[in-house]
A protein has these predicted regions:
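Catalytic cores of nucleotide-sugar-dependent glycosyltransferases that transfer UDP/GDP/TDP-activated
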Residues: 2-172
């Protein structure tokens, strides 16, 4: 991602890059979205509720405020799970914008109710509606609840808010 960002900048494009966690903000054009406390809170709540991707309200609002300032022509998403962004708030914001969206999928989390790798256990519930998830103990770990059916429905609704003309999916 950073190579693409730097290549765009070298060509005179006003490019910005944001990432979820682990590295501190470098400058105005290269910033971390999440606070450490936000990641821990999101991860902890998700472990109890199986709602990974639906917390981080404060960090998401701050990120979207930055996008409001930038007013991007294109938003290129990569993995949007990892306890740092609220996918509902992100996609509801994207639905109100005129920008194009490119989403590079590095795993299957976007199309399942819980897991990023359904093929590990040969599960095909994601095709018709997740439930009784066999991978709650794997990433993203959920200890007490199985919300895979609700998550699958919510993600399906959110991730189809943008028309095919506005969003391009890429799978390496």
């Amino acid at each position: 991602m950073r190579n693409l960002h730097h290549d765009l900048q070298e060509k005179g494009v006003d490019s910005f890059i944001f990432w979820g966690r682990r590295h501190e903000t470098i400058n105005n054009h290269e910033q971390c979205i999440a606070s450490r406390a936000g990641v821990y809170a999101h991860g902890g709540l998700a472990r109890f509720t199986d709602r990974a991707g639906f917390y981080s309200h404060g960090d998401t609002r701050r990120f979207l405020a930055k996008l409001d300032e930038i007013r991007p022509d294109v938003v290129h998403l990569h993995n949007i799970h990892g306890y740092y962004i609220n996918v509902a708030e992100l996609f509801e914001w994207l639905a109100t914008q005129n920008c194009k969206v490119i989403w590079t999928l590095h795993d299957c989390w976007a199309i399942t109710g819980h897991c990023p790798h359904f093929q590990y256990v040969g599960c095909e519930r994601w095709k018709t509606g997740c439930h009784d998830c066999p991978q709650l103990g794997g990433y993203p770990t959920a200890y007490f609840m199985d919300q895979s059916e609700r998550n699958w429905k919510d993600k399906r609704r959110l991730f189809t808010m943008l028309s095919a003309e506005r969003m391009l999916l890429v799978s390496p």
